[in-house]
Amino acid sequence: MSVQPLLDAAGRRRSPATMPGFRAGIAPRNKGQSYPADPPTVDEIVAVMRQAGHDRHGHRLSALVVVLWRAGLRIHEALSLTETDLDGRRGSILVRHGKNDRRREVGMDACGWSAIEPWLADRVGLPVGPLFCVIDGPTRGRAWSDSAARVELRHLALNAGVRRRFAPHQLRHAHAVELMHEGIPLPLIQRQLGHSHLSTTGTYLEGINNEEIISTVHARRPPMMHASAGLAL
């Protein structure tokens, strides 16, 4: 059945899908689904950033990838940032609206700060507002929506040839695993990620980092067997 256009308050024709409350009360198609933790590799992340290009849209998308990956923010934390929340001199990012609206300050490395510079330069020419904002059109300068950012990330990853799920939280996973591999103490990783309890961080990393068990089992010696067993390994 075709969707009949409606008229908004200004008398303009609009599809019901664009009207406020269109899907109110309807659960999203992926409600209840869980996705395995599968952080992208550095090569895959860099490939996505290169695919983004060098215009303002590309700079914005690359900067979002960097903040999720090199600072480990949640997507809503990143999209809630303002320009004044960034302190490049100290290398810090102020998260004003973390999970359960908790406030915290996190760090980001020099590589990350260098990578977001093109977007910071572009952002100066746009209206004051959220760090990650709409670039064109009547809503220019307003907050970039979560759904729009996710769609762009997904399309960019496909175009870059990334064959695994490339979602904002996967980049946060990558950040956590990298910190652990670098020997960062678990309590510091907990504070960086904004977990309320250390046990949450331990469980989080246990589920997404299997290198130790893989390397240990892979290095096992072959089984000892009697020469007459007739089994060649």
Regions found by a protein language model. Name each.
Residues 1-233:
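Conserved catalytic core of the tyrosine transesterase superfamily
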